């Protein structure tokens, strides 16, 4: 990866500024030549409103959800955006204050109410946010924006209008679900969320939503729990942002970042707290890796253990001759990385941003190899017999398998994050290339391509330019894994530049193919997808 770049001008602060939605799409100015085969829409979610009246949101994952769309047709591009009409957004706009508690911001009772009304409003129970700012994904013929609670929001991908809120609790037993479901080529959706299992203890359920059937009924109404993972702590589930899926196995990585449910239910209801207040780290747990047989719908009680890390994004998982290969974007240690993503930190001047990031867990791309066939006679031995990996799996005397990873990429305070692959063809299969957003002390300032076999990297980077998660779009006649383009939304506040643009790169070498510039700022976006025409 390229050398570290400095950002003394602080242009990254534009990522965290409130913007207005658009009444109609804008025509973008295209330089270069957009491939004619690239037709469809890039849909992305992120925060677009960072304060309500005089009340600020405090955390990166608090701002109200803004849905973005870049349309591609015959070499032309338009840009549109609208706020998602969630309950959190509509009530905030109506009451001109923050009404529903967000990830790192507490909502307090209406100050206009008398003291008795305000007191009793604390006892209404936990009001969970539906602020769908993290991702968008398809279910059948429909599209849903999501956060990580039990609420998802159905949207119109053409007009960006909000259609309705859906509560997953009405269909399956989960307290929430991740923003990174897996979608198989037939349209089947898998996701994971924590739940109350036997004896009121916490567990993790895998949810399966079938593809659209001939009866055209909403697939969500046919959701089912297919397998359950146990929890290492009876009353403290781990934070889960993604999981691994292959044709035959489901992989769940249980990290030491825990949600204290007693704190969640008591302090929130009684005196006010937010989600961030309810996280804590188990400093002795390390990381537990769990697997389940997907086809037999059975949990496999292999005890995989390793040293502590934070995990938000799986890159890919696949099977290889009796082993599971699990590639992850890790952050070393047990301290919660989100502690460093408060907006006050991210909006600091460059030297302060660097100082804060130096205290945080450090990033590393890792490959773990999980043996599936365990012979107790091999106690004390490395069970991995695959060539071309330095990862190890030692069978310990207590029948646990201690894992040490192969490092695929490591750079001090230089993260390879928000990973993407040629998902449609290579998810759950052996692959070669991953694309990622390069974070420089948490500031996104480059796009990266990683060869996971040779560890070779390619980088796109320009001064005063702050890209988003790269989205890979395969060429319709692709012959190789990386035949296609990479799309990224770039904020460019530097002198002489348009405020933002959609960047199109050749997926082979990250050379620029074209860009589509707009005259308005675009705030940070987290995740999204390319919807082909």
Swiss-Prot record:
Gene Ontology molecular function terms on file: all-trans-retinyl-ester hydrolase, 11-cis retinol forming activity; all-trans-retinyl-palmitate hydrolase, 11-cis retinol forming activity; beta-carotene 15,15'-dioxygenase activity; cardiolipin binding; isomerase activity; metal ion binding; phosphatidylcholine binding; phosphatidylserine binding
InterPro entries (UniProt xref): Carotenoid_Oase (IPR004294)
Residue(s) carrying N6-acetyllysine: 113
Tissue: Retinal pigment epithelium specific.
One cellular-component annotation, GO: plasma membrane
Topology versus the membrane: Lipid-anchor
Lipid linkage positions (S-palmitoyl cysteine): 112, 231, 329-330
Sites bearing Phosphoserine, chain numbering: 117
Residues the entry annotates as binding Fe cation: 180, 241, 313, 527
Cofactor(s) recorded in Swiss-Prot or TrEMBL: Fe(2+)
Free-text cofactor note: Binds 1 Fe(2+) ion per subunit.
Keyword Iron: yes
Modification after translation: Palmitoylation by LRAT regulates ligand binding specificity; the palmitoylated form (membrane form) specifically binds all-trans-retinyl-palmitate, while the soluble unpalmitoylated form binds all-trans-retinol (vitamin A).
Superkingdom, natural source: Eukaryota
Record family assignment: Belongs to the carotenoid oxygenase family.
Subunit (UniProt): Interacts with MYO7A; this mediates light-dependent intracellular transport of RPE65.
Function: Critical isomerohydrolase in the retinoid cycle involved in regeneration of 11-cis-retinal, the chromophore of rod and cone opsins. Catalyzes the cleavage and isomerization of all-trans-retinyl fatty acid esters to 11-cis-retinol which is further oxidized by 11-cis retinol dehydrogenase to 11-cis-retinal for use as visual chromophore. Essential for the production of 11-cis retinal for both rod and cone photoreceptors. Also capable of catalyzing the isomerization of lutein to meso-zeaxanthin an eye-specific carotenoid.
Protein name: Retinoid isomerohydrolase
Source organism per UniProt: Chlorocebus aethiops
Gene name of the record: RPE65
């Amino acid at each position: 990866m390229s050398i570290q770049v400095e950002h003394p001008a602080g242009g990254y602060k534009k990522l965290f500024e409130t913007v207005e939605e658009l009444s109609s799409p804008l025509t973008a100015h295209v330089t270069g030549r957009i491939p004619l085969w690239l037709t469809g829409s890039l849909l992305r979610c992120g925060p677009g409103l960072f304060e309500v009246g005089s009340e600020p949101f405090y955390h990166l994952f608090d701002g109200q959800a803004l849905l973005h769309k870049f349309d591609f047709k015959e070499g032309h591009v338009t840009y549109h955006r609208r706020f998602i009409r969630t309950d959190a957004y509509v009530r905030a706009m109506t009451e001109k204050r923050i009404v529903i508690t967000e990830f790192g911001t507490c909502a307090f009772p209406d100050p206009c109410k008398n003291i008795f009304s305000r007191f009793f409003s604390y006892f209404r129970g936990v009001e969970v946010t539906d602020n769908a700012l993290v991702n968008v994904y398809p279910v059948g013929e429909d599209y849903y924006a999501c956060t990580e609670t039990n609420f998802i929001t159905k949207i119109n991908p053409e007009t960006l209008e909000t259609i309705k809120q859906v509560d997953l609790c009405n269909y399956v037993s989960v307290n929430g679900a991740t923003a990174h479901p897996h979608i198989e080529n037939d349209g089947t959706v898998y996701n994971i969320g924590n739940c109350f299992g036997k004896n009121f203890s916490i567990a993790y359920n895998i949810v399966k939503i079938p593809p659209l059937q001939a009866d055209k009924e909403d697939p969500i109404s046919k959701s089912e729990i297919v397998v359950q993972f146990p929890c290492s702590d009876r009353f403290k589930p781990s934070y889960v942002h993604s999981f691994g899926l292959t044709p035959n196995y489901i992989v769940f990585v249980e990290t030491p970042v825990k949600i204290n449910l007693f704190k969640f239910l008591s302090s929130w209801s009684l005196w006010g707290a937010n989600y961030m207040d309810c996280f804590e780290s188990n400093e002795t747990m390390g990381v537990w890796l769990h697997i389940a047989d997907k086809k037999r719908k059975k949990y496999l009680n292999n005890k995989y253990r390793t040293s502590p890390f934070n995990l938000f994004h799986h890159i890919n998982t696949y099977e290889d001759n009796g082993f599971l290969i699990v590639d992850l974007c890790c952050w070393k240690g047990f301290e919660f990385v989100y502690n460093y993503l408060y907006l006050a930190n991210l909006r600091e001047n460059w030297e302060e941003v660097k100082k804060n990031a130096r205290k945080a867990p450090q990033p590393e791309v890792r490959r773990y190899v999980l043996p599936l066939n365990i012979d107790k006679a091999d106690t004390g031995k490395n069970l991995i017999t695959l060539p071309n990996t330095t990862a190890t799996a030692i069978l310990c005397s207590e029948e646990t398998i201690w894992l040490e990873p192969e490092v695929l990429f490591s750079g001090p305070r230089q993260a390879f994050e928000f990973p993407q692959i040629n998902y449609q063809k290579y998810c759950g299969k052996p692959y070669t290339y991953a694309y990622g957003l390069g974070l420089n002390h948490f500031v996104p300032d480059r796009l990266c391509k990683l060869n996971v076999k040779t560890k070779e990297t390619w980088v796109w980077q320009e001064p005063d330019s702050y890209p988003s998660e790269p989205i890979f779009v395969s060429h319709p006649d692709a012959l190789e894994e990386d035949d296609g383009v990479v799309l990224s939304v770039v904020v460019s506040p530097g002198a002489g530049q348009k405020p933002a643009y959609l960047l199109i790169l050749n997926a082979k070498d990250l050379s620029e193919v074209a860009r589509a510039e707009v005259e308005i700022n675009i705030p940070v976006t987290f995740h999204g997808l390319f919807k082909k025409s």
